[in-house]
């Protein structure tokens, strides 16, 4: 069954949920019909247990159960699943968060289906120069 949404949000990791929470809350308060997709990129229960309760957000509408193999296989899996989902779940806008594999895969699927992509990074920086992944 086909359904049109005002927006689709795709998340895959705990930091994505943290970044998506304020937007999801805003969409719900303003009755913006949103499809909320969790790719399942992080399967570790400690990374996702209680996240919905902690952030006071609803659980995702769809869980893709992405395999925990390597990044290439994850990307291919997510692109394939989202391409199929986007055939029956339409929206002009797809939102992605952060810079994880799920973000890349959702961007590819969004482009494949000629939908508009928006990206939220949210500028999270610790300014701790000992964290090698965050150097500016």
What are these regions (language model features)?
Residues 32-74, 81:
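Conserved nucleotide-sugar phosphate-binding/catalytic loop shared by glycosyltransferases and other
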Residues 117-132:
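A short, histidine- and acid-enriched strand-loop-helix "catalytic/donor-clamping" loop
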Residues 134-136:
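Conserved small/polar residues in nucleotide/adenosyl-binding loops
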Residues 95-112:
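An aromatic- and histidine-rich active-site surface loop
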Residues 1-41:
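N-terminal subdomain of nucleotide-sugar transferases
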Residues 79-89:
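Short, well-structured alpha-helical segments in soluble
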Residues 6, 10, 37, 92-93, 96-97, 120:
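Structural motif
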């Amino acid at each position: 069954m086909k359904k049109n949404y005002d927006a689709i949000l795709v998340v895959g990791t705990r930091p994505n949920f943290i970044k998506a929470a304020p937007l999801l809350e805003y969409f719900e308060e303003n009755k913006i019909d949103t499809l909320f997709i969790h790719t399942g990129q992080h399967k570790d229960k400690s990374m996702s247990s209680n996240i919905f309760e902690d952030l006071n957000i609803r659980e995702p509408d769809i869980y893709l159960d992405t395999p925990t193999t390597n990044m290439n296989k994850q990307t291919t899996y997510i692109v394939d699943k989202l391409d199929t989902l986007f055939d029956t779940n339409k929206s002009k806008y797809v939102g992605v968060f952060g810079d994880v594999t799920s973000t890349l895969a959702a961007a590819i699927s969004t482009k494949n289906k000629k939908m508009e992509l928006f990206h939220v990074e949210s500028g999270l920086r610790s300014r701790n120069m000992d964290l090698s992944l965050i150097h500016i």
